Amino acid sequence: MATGEPRDRGGYYFRFLPQRTFSSLSAREITNRLRQWSMLGRIQAQAFGFDQTFQPYQKDDFVTAFFKDPNVIPHLQLLAESSGQWTTLGTEVKRIEAINVPCTQLSMSFFQRLYDENIVRESGHIVKCLDSFCDPFLISDELRKVLLMEDSEKYEVFSPVEREEFLFCLFKHLCLGGSLCQYEDVLKPYLETAKLIYKDLVSVRKHPRTKEIQITSSVFKVKAYDSLGVCYPSPKEHEQTFSYFVVDPIKRHVNVLYHCYGVGEMA
């Protein structure tokens, strides 16, 4: 049997946690930013509990069980491609794909190099450039060149491994936004929002002996397939359509961050 193909529910049982809210996505200042970035109404976080010990190598069994669980099926939200309304999956998952996403960053100093390399001025303003396209994104500043253009001279400011980091992925998703994204002139809103969402989703603990802060969560980028192809996060694939599962093995919680690329709420 191929990796990721459902066998049974792998011993995991889940429960929806509607009482777990995510202030990083609901605070007024953040919703105003998400509206400007054309992501409001198209991004959501949900929490689920589970009842078994979790190890990262069990990710395929874990995610397969998640999509099969009767306590998940009526609650897991996604945007319908046709109506653009929130709905549930409504199809049987035949196969899953769960990719490990490194999650090691404990500080926003990770992005200091944007200042050091003159991608962002000391004032916080993002350096502009001549407009170009990296389909489907308009590139009008040095930040988006660093994020998208592999042949740009400063693309190597972040290594391939660093670009896989969950914090970098969040930051990039916010910078690129939805289909009618209005870009920021300054860096601060992107950094602040990425930090808030990251802290809201990722669990840490203090090591009992060394007192060092450690990240305890494991992160996976997830897709699910039915008999026709990709069904989750959306049948229509896009770099800005994603679902991340952030698993806390100590609390036995999984936070699901979902976004579907399109036109966000404007009013």
From Swiss-Prot:
Keywords: Cell projection, Cytoplasm, Cytoskeleton
Chain ranges passing through the membrane: none
Localization annotation: Cytoplasm; Cytoplasm, Cytoskeleton, Cilium axoneme
Disulfide partners: none
One GO cellular component term: motile cilium
Source organism superkingdom: Eukaryota
Predominant localisation class: cytoplasm
InterPro entries the UniProt entry points to: CFAP300
Name of one Pfam family that matches: CFAP300
Oligomeric form and interacting partners: Interacts with DNAAF2.
Similarity annotation: Belongs to the CFAP300 family.
Described purpose of this protein according to its UniProt entry: Cilium- and flagellum-specific protein that plays a role in axonemal structure organization and motility. May play a role in outer and inner dynein arm assembly.
Designated name of the protein: Cilia- and flagella-associated protein 300
Organism of this sequence: Rattus norvegicus
Lineage of producing organism: Eukaryota, Metazoa, Chordata, Craniata, Vertebrata
